[in-house]
């Protein structure tokens, strides 16, 4: 799991917040090797894009953002 987190952090530093959260959810749903291939492909695709400094999108921050999104959705649908 550690290699996925490191790769995820390197990829998401160049993405928008919504896309990073979607990839976070997808990484939990896919098998480990498929998630790694997806992240490697995205890393290659965005290799020349400048990192975003607006906000942190590391694994743990995306986990927090996803938790916030889930709690907001459960409150509004209740």
Swiss-Prot record:
A motif (Nuclear export signal) lies at residues 35-43. Signal peptide: none annotated. The keyword Phosphoprotein does not apply. The keyword DNA repair does not apply. Transmembrane segments: none annotated. GO terms for cellular component: host cell nucleus; virion component. Keywords: Host nucleus, Virion. It is found in: Virion; Host nucleus. A motif (Nuclear localization signal) lies at residues 45-54. Seems to function as a Vpr-like protein, since it mediates host cell cycle arrest in G2 phase. Cell cycle arrest creates a favorable environment for maximizing viral expression and production. This is Probable Vpr-like protein. It comes from Feline immunodeficiency virus (isolate Petaluma).
């Amino acid at each position: 799991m550690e290699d996925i987190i490191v790769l995820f952090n390197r990829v998401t530093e160049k993405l928008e917040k919504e896309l990073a959260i979607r990839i976070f959810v997808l990484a939990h749903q896919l098998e480990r090797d498929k998630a790694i291939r997806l992240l490697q492909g995205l890393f290659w695709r965005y290799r020349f894009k400048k990192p975003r400094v607006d906000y942190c999108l590391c694994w743990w921050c995306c986990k927090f953002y996803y938790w916030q999104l889930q709690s907001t959705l459960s409150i509004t649908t209740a």
